[in-house]
């Protein structure tokens, strides 16, 4: 076994060969920290905004995020701040890595300080009650601001560890896509572009549902056949739902769709997978969330998507079975049983029109 790492095989970024973009990440969770660290490593003048002054001071002094990424040394040039105006005024890109339930509140708070900055969501969720995507919230609260969303198979610990990864920046603005690629693209982190904002955003939000399902099923030691069936039928559900909302189904064949789905459904590092595994092991929802200690967007997404799927008459048996297990006390094995019930005959439904039986 060799001790050679991927980071040993690539040349470090030569800072003076890059234009130093001024980048801020709002939110000091695991993914926000990973993106801030990556931008810093790429030569950007980077700040990370954290509500807790004590936590910000600790990051500046120790170069560790002890709460969310305690095993990884952060770039010493990364500056943590708790002053929101300082964090966003006169910056080039603002990445927002705030949980969906607080996303609108924070975007409202920064609005007085926003001029020409690009706002990019890192949040994979849907706002409760309104069914608004994070891009919708940005458009509503900051109507004149260029915006985008970043999504893909991006487990924070792997990114910070320097393992090769890829993501998608979706925006209607070519300038936003280019700026984000400039800030984050490196030899170990590829940033692909897309103009299907809602498609990319939906992939990131919906896959959290199926990560919970996979974690729950894994607690029962299911076989590889069942795992494969869950993932592929999950992709069918995602694309069915997305098409109803106007997204391009082909987006779901990329990194932000099947890529993110595969990574999240197969990794114990995934927060939503951990929640599902805990539920499948007999814990209550409150116990599972408390043990995780972080936000798992999938729980809220299940509620929002099930409600909208009923309104739109979209066939989503896995999502419906999950809702019944988590909120109505049905046995977790109902997830697997839901896949075996009569439904759509066709496999790839946006290629072959489906028929119900």
Curated annotation (Swiss-Prot):
Catalytic reactions of this protein: sn-glycerol 3-phosphate + NAD(+) = dihydroxyacetone phosphate + NADH + H(+); sn-glycerol 3-phosphate + NADP(+) = dihydroxyacetone phosphate + NADPH + H(+)
Record GO terms (molecular function): glycerol-3-phosphate dehydrogenase [NAD(P)+] activity; NAD binding
Binding positions (NADPH): 30-31, 51, 124, 156, 271, 297
Function noted in UniProt: Catalyzes the reduction of the glycolytic intermediate dihydroxyacetone phosphate (DHAP) to sn-glycerol 3-phosphate (G3P), the key precursor for phospholipid synthesis.
Family: Belongs to the NAD-dependent glycerol-3-phosphate dehydrogenase family.
GO cellular component: cytosol
Keywords, ordered alphabetically: Cytoplasm, Lipid biosynthesis, Lipid metabolism, NAD, NADP, Nucleotide-binding, Oxidoreductase, Phospholipid biosynthesis, Phospholipid metabolism
Classification lineage: Bacteria, Pseudomonadati, Pseudomonadota, Gammaproteobacteria, Moraxellales
Protein name: Glycerol-3-phosphate dehydrogenase [NAD(P)+]
EC code(s) of this entry: 1.1.1.94
Active site: 207 (proton acceptor)
Residues reported to bind sn-glycerol 3-phosphate: 124, 152, 207, 260, 270-272
Cross-referenced PANTHER family: GLYCEROL-3-PHOSPHATE DEHYDROGENASE, GLYCEROL-3-PHOSPHATE DEHYDROGENASE [NAD(+)] 2, CHLOROPLASTIC
Pathway: Membrane lipid metabolism; glycerophospholipid metabolism
Family annotation (Pfam families): NAD_Gly3P_dh_C, NAD_Gly3P_dh_N
């Amino acid at each position: 076994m060799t001790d050679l790492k991927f980071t040993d095989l690539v040349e470090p970024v030569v800072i003076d060969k890059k234009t130093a973009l001024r980048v801020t990440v709002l939110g000091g969770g695991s993914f926000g920290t990973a993106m801030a660290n990556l931008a810093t490593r790429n030569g950007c003048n980077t700040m990370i905004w954290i509500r807790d002054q004590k936590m910000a001071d600790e990051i500046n002094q120790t170069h560790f995020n002890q709460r969310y990424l305690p095993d990884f040394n952060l770039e010493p040039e990364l500056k943590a701040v708790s002053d929101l105006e300082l964090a966003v005024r006169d910056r080039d890109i603002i990445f927002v890595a705030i949980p969906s339930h607080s996303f609108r509140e924070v975007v409202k708070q920064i609005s007085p300080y926003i001029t020409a900055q690009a706002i990019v969501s890192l949040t994979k969720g849907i706002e409760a009650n309104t069914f608004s995507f994070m891009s919708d919230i940005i458009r509503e609260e900051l109507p004149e601001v260029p915006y985008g969303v970043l999504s893909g198979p991006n487990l924070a610990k792997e990114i910070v560890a320097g393992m090769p990864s890829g993501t998608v920046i979706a925006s209607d603005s070519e300038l936003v896509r280019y700026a984000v690629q400039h800030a984050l693209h490196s030899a170990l982190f590829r940033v692909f572009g897309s103009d299907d904002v809602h498609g990319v955003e939906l992939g990131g939000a919906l896959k959290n549902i199926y990560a919970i399902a996979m974690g729950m099923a894994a607690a029962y030691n299911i076989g590889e056949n069942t795992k494969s069936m869950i993932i592929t039928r999950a992709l069918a559900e995602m694309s069915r739902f997305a098409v109803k909302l106007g997204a391009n189904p082909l987006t779901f064949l990329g990194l932000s769709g099947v890529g993110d789905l595969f990574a999240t459904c197969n990794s114990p590092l995934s927060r939503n997978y951990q929640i599902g595994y805990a539920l499948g092991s007999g814990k209550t929802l409150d116990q599972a969330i408390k043990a995780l200690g972080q936000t798992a967007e999938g729980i809220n997404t299940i509620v929002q998507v099930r409600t909208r799927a009923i309104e739109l008459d979209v066939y989503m048996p896995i999502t419906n079975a999950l809702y019944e297990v988590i909120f109505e006390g049905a046995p977790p094995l109902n997830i697997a049983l839901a896949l075996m019930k009569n439904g759509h005959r066709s496999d790839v439904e946006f290629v072959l029109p489906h028929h119900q039986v």
